[in-house]
Amino acid sequence: MGRAREMGWMAAGLMIGAGACYCMYKLTMGRSEGNELEDEEEDEWEDGQDLDEEEADNWFDFTAMARPWSEDGDWDEPGAPGGTEDRRSGGGKANRAHPIKQRPFPYEHKNIWGEQSFKSFTCILDLNKCVSTQRKKRFTKNINAGFSLSPNISKHLASLSVVGNRSPTPHPTVREKALFVPENPNSSLENQGQIKMSIDEVCRETLLCCCKSFLQQAGLSLLISMTVINNMLAKSVSDLKFPLLSKGSGCAEVRGLEELMSLSEKPVLVGEALAAQMLSSFMCLFTRSGSREMLVEAISP
């Protein structure tokens, strides 16, 4: 009887001890889970602050980041078209230079005026009655990538059309012939011959109308530019005898002299006929009364 009672008390003690251990275990686990939740919340809050700081840093980097091209449109940093860029090739290998392909627009920096942009620009300037503005507009550069001729010729074609449109001559035929120059010329000999015939007539008729010779100067500049790329026109241009330089206005004479002096640096391109005309024009101006000052102004640096 006593033995059974002892066994009962022992079983009860074991059950009470097991219950106490279980309660202690639950209390300990609950406290640990609470601490972990608090730690996770603190970590999330700290991560959020780190992300905000990183976003601020990234925003600063994007606004202060240097462009891959300079103000002139030239790529001057790694990653430029046709350049190389250092990349980690992986596998513990050293850095290698990988070629970079040409990047498409808008990464390709372009600064070319289109034909429509130039027309809009000239229309705006037409509304301006200032004499100096109109004079500058007469020699505005129009460089269009669609022109098959050189940019210099395209510039003079545009100048000739603008000058013809603003010409104060009373004869409408002169303006029509000046505007007859096609907007998108090609390099064919037939088309160049038509341009030359039109300019010849414009120069001669404008000379009779005393049109300040600006239209003549634009035509002369175009012809000189075309002689550089076409030997046939180099021979025919001497037939004009440069009436601009012998009978034109002072400002146009100086501009014509500047054109001829620029050609004197390239005698191989312009040929002997044009070089002889240049020399005779210089002599004619030098012997004329009141022309020496213009000659000094033209040849001075």
UniProtKB/Swiss-Prot annotation:
Q: Which domain of life is it from?
A: Eukaryota
* Compartments reported by the entry: Mitochondrion; Mitochondrion outer membrane
Topological domain (Cytoplasmic) residues are 26-301
User: Where is the stretch described as Disordered?
Assistant: 69-101
Q: Which UniProt keywords apply?
A: Membrane, Mitochondrion, Mitochondrion outer membrane, Signal-anchor, Transmembrane, Transmembrane helix
Pfam families, A to Z? Arm_2
Question: So where does this one cross the membrane?
Answer: 8-25
Tissue expression summary: Highly expressed in the developing neural tissues, neural crest derivatives and hind limbs. Also widely expressed in the adult nervous tissue, especially in the forebrain, including the cerebral cortex, hippocampus and thalamus.
Q: Which ranges of this chain reside in the Mitochondrial intermembrane compartment per its record?
A: 1-7
Indicate where this protein is primarily found. Answer: mitochondrion
Q: Which GO terms describe its cellular component?
A: mitochondrial outer membrane
* Keyword Transmembrane helix found: yes
Q: Which PANTHER family match?
A: ARMADILLO REPEAT CONTAINING PROTEIN, PROTEIN ARMCX6
Which family is annotated? Answer: Belongs to the eutherian X-chromosome-specific Armcx family.
Q: What the protein does? A: May regulate the dynamics and distribution of mitochondria in neural cells.
Q: What is this protein called?
A: Protein ARMCX6
Species of origin? Mus musculus (Mouse)
